[in-house]
Amino acid sequence: MKIKHLLFFIPVTFLVACEGTDLIEPDNVSKEQISTQIIYNPTKYSKQKGDVFVKSSLPTTMAKQIPNACVTSIMEYANNKVFGGTVNEGAYILYYTQTYNSNPLIDGVSLDYIEPFVTHFFKTQTFTNYKSAIDAKHPVMTDVNSQIESSAHNVLCVGYNSNTGAAIYMDPELACMYSVNAGYFLQDYNITRWRN
């Protein structure tokens, strides 16, 4: 069995926006850096000097997700593009439907089930911080705000820029990578390995 790295699940307790060039994470924010507004908006990724990725030559686009299937889309992207696996998104959808008696294409993946669902396919560990995770070649499954009430949208942080501090993530709904301050993310799931 070949083991690969991916990172998973510890909720971030606050969001902050900071000035400067450091990645904005709870473990490196001083009170002087905290702003009253989140001032960083995601921008479409474009290659820059200082980009660091979990894998070199990672595709910056992907197939657009099926509605409500951001989690399973990101799982397929992580397995196939980051780790070189071959699992089709349909396998994740079928497993979730049979195990949790719920169709993720209608209901999405419940926050109550996301941890056991992801850990069935990926070996996970506690989130530390984005820079350390990416430097260790561990992508970070995380969430951003959703326009759907009482829900979040799942994305995969796959890099950062060492000059600007921006986190780089794949968004399955938009089917391409974006750059943003890491304070934009809602929660972090350290995915350390995939199981095959």
Question: Where are these predicted regions, by residue range?
Answer:
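Sec-dependent signal peptide recognition
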Residues: 2-9
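Active-site-adjacent structural segments surrounding the nucleophilic cysteine of cysteine proteases
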Residues: 18-103, 146-148, 163
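Conserved active-site-adjacent core of cysteine acyl-enzyme catalytic domains
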Residues: 79-81, 90-196
